């Protein structure tokens, strides 16, 4: 029967302690209160005892009756003084050691800072040199570009000058052409008049006369060809004479224009064949032929062409010039002869007389023409000479301009270089000044070191940056230290209060008992004075002035806490659009009420042990095992259908191998969701007090009935894990097989910053040897080279009862009959009794192959207990190199995380029992940091080391991946939970949860719960604003989150990430939410039901989060999910798919945030109120049962 949660109406003021979320190893332990007296005090007491005995014999008891209490008080004060001195000496040694460590760390940080600054200076110098080189290159490129621009400008100017010269030459050519045409017309008119005067006969006779030479005859071909029949008018004659004159006067054309204009002019005035006879054309073109320019000459530059023209003009010798001039004159004479006007020196004597009258007129015109031709030749020669001189002057001007521009650019470049050099000189002078200033500062450094930082005049930016970084680091450390100090000082106050009460209540002490034999029972010790002295001495030893009066401090804190809970209660009552149901604050969304967890029980762990502090728990797995005959004991989990298990075999059934394959595939498909259904409702809860651990066994279906309690060890247990019995087909390990897993480290290359990969992944075999039998008879094993580790103690007690000596035997309280006895098993549910009955006939020798429970302790031991037989009897005890922090079971292997940075892997032998030959040790990191937690993810083991997650292959024992889950190195990964294809992580002292992909290790989502809790519970002084996650659980596709302030949150998973994370509907108030950062996306088409386990990514949306009003006063220690029994009226033989899942949370104290602690009456005579004790809260959730057919 489940226990219903009844509201508690009576409240009382209580002192709540803030338990630190992280175990600090190596802390100081509590002093032993029941120690023996010091030797000196004992010697003095013996001497005084003898003296008092002598006085009693002489004077009787009345003589020493008043003296003896004074003597006893003096001796007690002396003993306390010795005790105080010893404690102060020990404390002084610890402070010295801490001081040395801090000094060493400071020196190391100082050296690292100097190295960093030196590297920074070197890098800065390198960059400055590179910048200077680049500046030089840029300057050279700029100078080259300026020279090229100058050359382009000069070429443009030269082209423009050539164009202007070309225009001038064209104008000159037009003027000369016009003048030549005028002369030609005058000459033609003269020829016509001469022919008219002479007559045709004389003209023909003159044509037939022989010429003096052939050259003159050829040159006169034009005049001879022009007869009356061929010349049809003045225009034809003008055209013929223009062609002759143009052809004969080639030298004149060369002086006037360049080659291009010569070609153009020749083509424009060339006569057609019909106008000139063939013989005349040949005569005109044969003596003087213009040479066509070659392509090479055409491609030459204008300047080169001008030089060639000048050379051609100047290279003509005087003989050629005379020939040309003679040709002109001869041509004129031939023209006269062709018209019948022969000069006088060439005429015969008989013709002289006849022509005297006509010679006078013609000779006058000829002389005028000859004078004009000579004048024209002289002018052309002078023009050519002037052109040559002009071209030379232009070339000289161009050269001088170019030289001037080049010199100007060089001057500019030198000026720029001078400016650069001046700047460098200025920089060097500034550097020299800076160096001088630094030198002066170095000389005065000794004096400035004595001056505080705030009093110094100079405060540079680097110093400010360093101070800010140091301040932030110190602030983070201060927050952690304040939390630890709060816990430590609270326990000190409670211890002092209890010591004072114990001293006041005691009737006899150690020294008083020593002297009690001298007097009768009527004499009582002065307890009040002794207690006052003890209290005062303890008060002086306490550093904090706040805890000198613990009663006053307790009352003040209780009053503050009541006021704070009152504020929380008022904030919770506000209407914010949310729904309250079953003690939960639900979002106003369309959700089924059946999905809300229903609280069914809330109770202290043990009523008769109010000082116990709950720590961890596990659900016992009643499956697997092997008996003495080698037969397998198979216990089917609850997720197999009972109806399918009762089916009889038929001839048509499939082969057993196919059924087994299908069963394995179905199990692998939803492995993470089926793990929570493998255990039973039998729960082992670990609690501790005064450094001793106690195990409480209960059934989650009926938690009010504690089945059995027994002490586990004299140390604090840090973890517990239920392990199933050996299963058929699980691998075994022998000495030969163990060697194949041995390997060295350094194989993983891509490592996060700050993680040393030298020994990462190194696996070695550690042999075990059996130690000498202990007093309790438990077989104890340790490694061959085991060395005694440094003593690590921590006081986990807040008990007001005086601590018991650890060497004294533990007195067990009367307990109910154990479950393994016939009387105790009747209290168990029927399904647990049936499961345990299968192991009744197995002897104790085979208990290692049966279901067991493994526990890891702070005292570096692993304890193995049987889960089905004698629970309190420890089967084996293994000494480890360091404290055991986490234990995970995978098939036939146990993975244990140790505080020295290693993982121990235990195996089964061929008999199915856990091997005592040895175990594998896998190195994860340095021994200064611990492997905090382990989590089974498919076939891998995820281990947390500092801020990193190390993924280990559970079968090959090889590290496959290492990634950083948090950027800060000092932020340790605390909890991990796997479901589907995602793993949720929580970070120590951080309110943000992180989701990673289980196979690709991709960061998928961040969820910050701090804004959500602040919105729900307000910003009071209960540290709700500084939220940290202390417990995580994934059950039935729901994430349970426990915080350091006792707040419990449950968030249903969604198979796909919703696009709209925050509700922004204006018609209704927005639901509470927090920071939700998404790094991945899933398909929107697939639904949750269609997804397989490997495809299901457990995204969270705080808009659907549910907050429980039932919580703990301190941090939530653990969550545990176990299957519940069938509901009343259900037929267990029927195949059902809806079963109960019980979610259990454990923590210090209980609080209902809707009520708080107001108006609770004080409980006099009790040191701990009921609501301050460790509590268990159990919820019931209707879960869909993943039934698989066998």
Swiss-Prot record:
The lineage of its organism: Eukaryota, Metazoa, Ecdysozoa, Nematoda, Chromadorea. One of its GO terms (molecular function) is kinase binding. It is found in: Cytoplasm, Perinuclear region. The gene is unc-16. InterPro entries: JIP3/JIP4, JIP_LZII, Quinoprotein_ADH-like_sf, RH1, RH2, WD40/YVTN_repeat-like_dom_sf. Residues 24-112 form the RH1 domain. This is JNK-interacting protein. Keywords: Coiled coil, Cytoplasm. It comes from Caenorhabditis elegans. Residues 78-165, 383-491 form a coiled coil.
């Amino acid at each position: 029967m489940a226990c219903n949660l009844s509201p508690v109406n009576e409240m009382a003021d209580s002192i709540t302690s803030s338990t630190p979320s992280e175990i600090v190893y190596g802390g100081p332990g509590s002093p032993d209160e029941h120690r023996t007296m010091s030797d000196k005090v004992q010697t003095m007491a013996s001497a005084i005892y003898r003296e008092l005995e002598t006085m009693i014999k002489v004077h009787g008891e009345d003589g020493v009756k008043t003296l003896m209490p004074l003597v006893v008080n003096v001796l007690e004060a002396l003993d306390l003084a010795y005790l105080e001195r010893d404690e102060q000496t020990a404390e002084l040694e610890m402070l010295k050691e801490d001081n040395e460590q801090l000094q060493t760390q400071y020196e190391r940080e100082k050296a690292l800072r100097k190295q960093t600054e030196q590297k920074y200076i070197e890098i800065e110098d390198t960059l400055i040199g590179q910048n200077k080189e680049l500046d030089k290159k840029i300057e050279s490129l700029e100078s080259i570009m300026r020279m090229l621009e100058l050359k382009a400008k000069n070429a443009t100017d030269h082209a423009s000058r050539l164009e202007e010269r070309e225009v001038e030459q064209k104008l000159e050519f037009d003027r000369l052409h016009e003048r030549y045409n005028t002369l030609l017309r005058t000459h033609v008119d003269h020829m016509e008049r001469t022919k008219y005067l002479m007559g045709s006969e004389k003209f023909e006779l003159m044509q037939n006369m022989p010429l003096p030479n052939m050259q003159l005859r050829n040159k006169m071909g034009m005049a001879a060809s022009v007869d009356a029949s061929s010349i049809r008018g003045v225009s034809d004659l003008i055209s013929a004479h223009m062609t002759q004159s143009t052809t004969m006067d080639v030298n004149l054309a060369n002086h006037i224009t360049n080659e291009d204009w010569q070609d153009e002019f020749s083509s424009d005035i060339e006569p057609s064949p019909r106008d000139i006879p063939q013989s005349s054309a040949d005569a005109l073109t044969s003596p003087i032929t213009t040479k066509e320019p070659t392509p090479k000459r055409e491609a030459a530059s204008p300047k080169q062409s001008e030089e060639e023209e000048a050379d051609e003009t100047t290279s003509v010798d005087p003989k050629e010039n005379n020939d040309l001039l003679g040709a002109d004159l001869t041509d004129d004479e031939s023209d006269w002869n062709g018209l019948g006007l022969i000069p006088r020196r060439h005429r015969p004597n008989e013709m002289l007389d006849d022509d005297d009258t006509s010679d006078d007129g013609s000779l006058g015109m000829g002389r005028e023409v000859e004078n004009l031709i000579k004048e024209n030749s002289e002018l052309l020669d002078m023009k050519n000479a002037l052109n040559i001189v002009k071209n030379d002057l232009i070339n000289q001007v161009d050269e001088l301009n170019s030289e001037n521009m080049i010199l100007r650019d060089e001057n500019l470049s030198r000026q720029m270089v001078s400016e650069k050099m001046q700047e460098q000189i200025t920089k060097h002078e500034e550097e020299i000044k800076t160096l001088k200033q630094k030198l002066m500062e170095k000389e005065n450094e000794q004096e400035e070191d004595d001056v505080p930082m705030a009093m110094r005049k100079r405060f540079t930016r680097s110093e400010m940056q360093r101070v800010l970084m140091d301040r932030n680091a110190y602030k983070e450390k201060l927050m952690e230290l304040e939390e630890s100090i709060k816990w430590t000082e609270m326990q000190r106050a409670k211890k002092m209060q209890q010591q004072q009460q114990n001293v006041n209540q005691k009737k006899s002490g150690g020294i008083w008992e020593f002297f009690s034999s001298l007097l009768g029972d009527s004499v009582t010790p002065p307890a009040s004075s002794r207690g006052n002295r003890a209290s005062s001495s303890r008060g002086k030893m306490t550093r904090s002035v706040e805890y000198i009066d613990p009663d006053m401090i307790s009352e003040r804190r209780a009053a503050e806490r009541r006021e704070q809970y009152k504020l929380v209660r008022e904030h919770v009552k506000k209407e914010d659009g949310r729904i309250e149901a079953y003690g939960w604050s639900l979002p106003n969304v369309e959700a089924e009420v059946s999905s809300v967890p229903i609280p069914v029980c809330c109770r202290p762990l043990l009523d008769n042990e109010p000082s116990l502090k709950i720590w961890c728990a596990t659900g016992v797995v009643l499956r697997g095992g092997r008996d003495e005959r080698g037969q397998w004991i198979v216990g089917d989990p609850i997720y197999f259908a009972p109806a399918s298990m009762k089916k009889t075999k038929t001839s048509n059934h499939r082969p057993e191998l196919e059924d087994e394959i299908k069963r394995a595939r179905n199990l692998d498909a939803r492995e993470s969701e089926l793990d929570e259904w493998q255990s039973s409702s039998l729960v082992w809860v670990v609690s501790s007090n005064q450094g001793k651990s106690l195990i409480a066994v209960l059934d989650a279906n009926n938690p009010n009935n504690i089945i059995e309690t027994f002490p586990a060890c004299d140390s604090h247990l840090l973890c517990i894990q239920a392990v199933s019995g050996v299963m058929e087909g699980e691998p075994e390990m022998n000495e030969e097989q163990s060697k194949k897993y041995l390997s060295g480290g350094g194989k993983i290359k891509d490592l996060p910053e700050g993680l040393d990969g030298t020994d990462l992944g190194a696996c070695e075999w550690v042999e075990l040897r059996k130690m000498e039998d202990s007093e309790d008879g438990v077989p104890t094993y340790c490694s061959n080279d085991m060395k005694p580790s440094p003593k690590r103690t921590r006081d986990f007690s807040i008990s007001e009862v005086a601590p018991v000596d650890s060497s004294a035997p533990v007195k067990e309280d009367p307990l109910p009959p154990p479950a393994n006895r016939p009387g105790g098993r009747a209290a168990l549910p029927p399904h647990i009794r049936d499961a345990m009955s299968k192991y009744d006939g197995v002897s104790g020798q085979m208990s290692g192959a049966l279901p067991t429970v493994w526990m890891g302790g702070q005292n570096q031991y692993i304890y193995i207990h049987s889960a089905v037989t004698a629970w309190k009897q420890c089967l084996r005890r293994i000494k480890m190199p360091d404290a055991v922090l986490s234990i995970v079971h995978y098939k036939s292997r146990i993975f244990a995380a140790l505080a020295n940075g290693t993982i121990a892997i235990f195996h089964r032998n061929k008999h199915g029992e856990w091997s005592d030959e040895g175990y594998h040790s896998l190195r994860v990191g340095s021994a200064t940091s611990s492997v905090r937690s382990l989590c089974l993810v498919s076939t891998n083991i995820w281990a947390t080391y500092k801020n990193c997650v190390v993924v280990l292959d559970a079968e090959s024992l090889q590290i496959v991946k290492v990634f950083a889950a948090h950027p800060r190195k000092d932020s340790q990964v605390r909890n991990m939970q796997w479901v589907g294809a995602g793993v949720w992580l929580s970070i120590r002292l951080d309110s943000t949860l992180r989701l990673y992909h289980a196979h690709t290790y991709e960061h998928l989502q961040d969820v910050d719960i701090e804004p959500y809790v602040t919105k729900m519970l307000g910003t009071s002084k209960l540290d709700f604003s500084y939220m940290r996650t202390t417990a995580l659980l994934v059950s039935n596709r729901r994430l349970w989150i426990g915080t350091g302030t006792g707040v419990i949150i449950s968030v249903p998973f969604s198979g796909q990430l919703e696009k709209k994370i925050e509700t922004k509907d204006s018609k209704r108030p927005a639901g509470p939410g927090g920071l939700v950062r998404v790094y991945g996306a899933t398909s929107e088409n697939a639904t949750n039901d269609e997804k397989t386990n490997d495809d299901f990514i457990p995204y969270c949306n705080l808009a659907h989060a549910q907050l429980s009003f039932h919580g703990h006063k301190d941090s939530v220690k653990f969550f545990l999910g176990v299957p519940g029994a069938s509901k009343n009226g259900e037929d267990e033989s029927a195949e059902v798919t809806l079963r109960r899942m019980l979610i259990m949370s454990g923590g210090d104290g209980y609080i209902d945030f809707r009520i708080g602690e107001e108006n609770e009456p004080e409980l006099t005579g009790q040191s701990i109120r009921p609501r301050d004790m460790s509590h268990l809260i159990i919820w019931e959730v209707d879960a869909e049962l993943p039934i698989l057919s066998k």
